Amino acid sequence: MASRSALTLSALRERIARPPRAWRNRIWAHRARLGGKPDVAEAMPEPVFLGDAGRGEELVAGSWRALGQSVAVGRASIWTAPIPDPRLEAERQACLWLDDLAALGNAAARVLAQAWVQDWIQRYGSGAGPGWEA
């Protein structure tokens, strides 16, 4: 039977050899950033929610509706629209509006969706901001 100090040293050695989860996640994220970008997604995930084409038309017209409130977006990005209720920020970050634009499915909806997603990447793609807070 091994002594207690030998077991402690063995456990310590294992712990040191295995990086903490937070460090592993950072290392994996860093490796992903250094890797090449895929040309296309291998598999497209099925949508969890089906969007509403009527709400998609409202978005293209410049109005975003969530939680029973309407927010004027105009021709600007959804990310620059002033939010009157703090609860709306979580709705905006959830990107359910993207499902509505997909349900509409026309060229205007596609252009708007691409522009807003690109704007989100520019603003929050570094891993900081309201979309990253749990």
Each predicted region: which residue ranges?
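Large, well-folded core regions of big proteins
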Residues: 79-82
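Extreme N-terminal leader/anchor segments
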Residues: 1-74
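Aromatic-lined, polymer-binding surfaces characteristic
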Residues: 85-134
